């Protein structure tokens, strides 16, 4: 038998600690439930990682202000112990090991990005400590029959589901589509699912191209797609990649009738970074602050947005709302279990049903929820809901005008 060297993140390693912050609570240690997390607070995806740190903190503070979490009639305060993984997946795994074995946190909140959640959930499974995470959507995370990982992002394979439905009804008609995606767990899952969605809907996939994660130069790729005369381009990537794709599309005068992106478009940062060039871009989100979503602690989605922006001076997006619901899920599950025992809380998570500011939470047998994606578009510098679960909400600005005609 030939031995195979396992990836670094599958091995339990001594933990190197970076960027530790611990929320201080003036209660006795035995009256505190500590949630541990490793999040990207520096490095290439820190701009998104901050949503999770901030969402965790504001939600913990909100729950504590309301009296905390009760177990057997006794109130407990929540605390957060969080590390900066510097956008390094191997460091993240070491930090989750540290959180469980040395810091002795009670439960785990997740990182951002599917490749991190895929790796870090190995630790929660090994030590049988429940992790609720709203940063990883790859189908691969939930294909391993793990019992201790729960996720509040919908399956990546269906991210473009609502977008494909929209494409069917556009005039002028969409026929040829380009599918472009990064070479990472999330984006590959998106592409695999979207490929089937497009074929089932009768579209021709004129280009099907993968690029290296964290790519900055898309000129060759864009030129190749441009030569195919596609009507629509669907891009699965992370925010910096998406920004570069738009900027370089403009410089190469690449103007299909439509392009849509998995991330970036719903955020205030996207619109600020691109200015007028953000207009006409389509994207998706599982959450909007205008949605009629009520919860136990903030009241509703709009109040969450108001409090979040007042505290952190930027608008929350679905990453923040998902992160907040992760904390809420633990509060609900702990009270339902009436215990701090990890197995009992895990079992409570598996059967829990409650309304969060992010939407209804109920995990399937794989540990995932399936909220439908909302299609959004930037119109005149503002984010506009185009298609919701019940169909079209507002008319899209389509087709996208040529760059030199704007």
UniProtKB/Swiss-Prot annotation:
Belongs to the leucine-binding protein family. The keyword Kinase does not apply. The keyword Transmembrane helix does not apply. Component of an amino-acid transport system. Residues 1-29 form the signal peptide. InterPro entries: BCAA_transport, Leu-bd, Peripla_BP_I. This is Leu/Ile/Val-binding protein homolog 5. Pfam families: Peripla_BP_6. GO terms for biological process: amino acid transport. Keywords: Amino-acid transport, Signal, Transport.
């Amino acid at each position: 038998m030939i031995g195979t060297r396992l990836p670094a993140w599958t091995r339990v390693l001594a933990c190197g600690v970076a960027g530790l912050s611990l929320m201080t609570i003036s209660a006795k240690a035995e009256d505190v439930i500590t949630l541990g997390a490793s999040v990207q607070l520096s490095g290439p995806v820190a701009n998104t990682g901050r949503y999770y740190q901030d969402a965790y903190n504001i939600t913990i503070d909100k729950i504590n202000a309301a009296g905390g979490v009760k177990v057997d009639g006794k109130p407990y305060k929540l605390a957060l112990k969080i590390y900066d993984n510097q956008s390094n997946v191997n460091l993240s795994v070491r930090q989750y090991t540290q959180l469980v074995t040395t810091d002795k946190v009670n439960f785990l909140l997740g990182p951002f990005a599917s490749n991190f959640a895929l790796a870090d959930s190995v630790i929660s499974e090994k030590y049988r400590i429940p992790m609720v995470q709203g940063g990883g959507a790859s189908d691969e995370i939930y294909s391993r029959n793990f019992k201790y990982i729960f996720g509040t992002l919908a399956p990546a394979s269906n991210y473009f589901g609502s977008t494909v439905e929209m494409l069917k009804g556009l005039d002028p008609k969409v026929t040829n589509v380009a599918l472009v995606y990064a070479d990472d767990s999330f984006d590959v899952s998106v592409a695999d699912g979207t490929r089937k969605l497009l074929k089932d809907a009768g579209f021709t996939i004129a280009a099907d191209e993968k690029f290296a994660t964290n790519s900055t130069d898309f000129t060759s790729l864009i030129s190749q797609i441009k030569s195919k005369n596609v009507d629509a381009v669907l891009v699965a990537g992370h925010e910096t990649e998406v920004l570069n794709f738009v900027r370089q599309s403009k410089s190469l005068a690449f103007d299909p009738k439509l392009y849509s992106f998995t991330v970036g478009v719903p955020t205030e940062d996207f619109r600020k970074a691109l200015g007028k060039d953000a207009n006409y871009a389509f994207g998706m989100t599982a959450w909007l602050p205008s949605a009629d979503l009520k919860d136990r602690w903030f009241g509703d989605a709009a109040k969450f947005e108001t409090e979040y922006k007042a505290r952190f001076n930027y608008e929350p997006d679905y990453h923040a709302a998902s992160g907040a619901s992760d904390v809420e899920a633990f509060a609900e599950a702990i009270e339902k279990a009436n215990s701090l025992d990890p197995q009992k809380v895990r079992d409570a998570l598996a059967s829990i049903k409650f309304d969060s500011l992010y939407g209804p939470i109920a995990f399937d047998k794989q540990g995932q929820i399936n909220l439908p994606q909302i299609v959004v578009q930037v119109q005149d510098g503002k984010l506009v809901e185009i298609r919701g679960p019940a169909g079209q909400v507002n008319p899209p600005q389509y087709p996208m005008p040529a760059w030199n005609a704007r």
